[in-house]
Amino acid sequence: AETPTNPLTDLCDIAALAALAHAHGALLAVDNSFASPVLQRPAQLGADLVVYSGTKLLDGQGRVMAGAVCGSTALVDKVMGAFMRSAGLNLAPFNAWVVLKGLETLSLRVKAQSAAALELARWLEAHPKVARVYYPGLPSHAQHALAMRQQGGLGGSVIAFDVVGEGAEQLRANAFHVADSTRVCSITANLGDVKTTITHPASTSHGRLTEAQRQAAGIGQGLIRISVGLEHLDDLKADLSRGLDTLA
């Protein structure tokens, strides 16, 4: 299970999923990359394995490719042992050191980014050229109560929103216009960085799906995902306004 999900920030009730999985003799693995251990600790809610992309929040500055699988020694050896023996597991020492340095500021970064993301999400929700905002920290999010309970009262640093427009072609053009008009945000698929990133999921993370598959998943051509960094909030609002305010 991935919670929150990419890019629509849907949530899974980890405790409920763990109970369901264990009742049927199954294990539960949770991808906690979007929340980080600062907001959410799946193992304490019953998950058997917790996985992370260390490239994202754990590093926080997009410097390394890294990942982690966390669980009991016995379980990790059972599910990963053959792979580890065949392919190896350890990061290069320098990359491991970089991630360790990132962990030193993880709590400060995640809390600051979550606070900024909430304010930016509120601003986007009120913008006339934004059709819908997806952010667990907003009361309008369908799973807001679960987010507050499961994520320590914070919504995280990732926001998704739909721009206005009629038809797939115009929606895509409008989304590209907003992204291309930014100067502070970095157009990249990475997230969790101290630098705010912006991306168009329909042509990046979900680009290999058919249009019908994207629509079924709720990924429209007008959808934009933002990972909020540590820039001044006024700068981010001005950066996004440049494109949003000039949409037809």
At which residue positions do the language-model features occur?
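PLP-dependent enzyme catalytic core of the Aspartate aminotransferase-like
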Residues: 5, 196-248
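Short, flexible turn/loop "capping" segments at secondary-structure junctions
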Residues: 60, 91-95, 150-154, 216-221
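Hydrophobic side chains in well-ordered alpha-helices
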Residues: 79, 174-178, 236-240
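Short, solvent-exposed amphipathic alpha-helical segments in soluble enzyme
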Residues: 84, 180-184, 241-245
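Short, well-ordered beta-strand elements within core beta-sheets of diverse protein domains
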Residues: 98-108, 156-168, 225-229
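Conserved small-domain helix->loop->beta segment predominantly found in fold-type I
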Residues: 118-194, 209-215
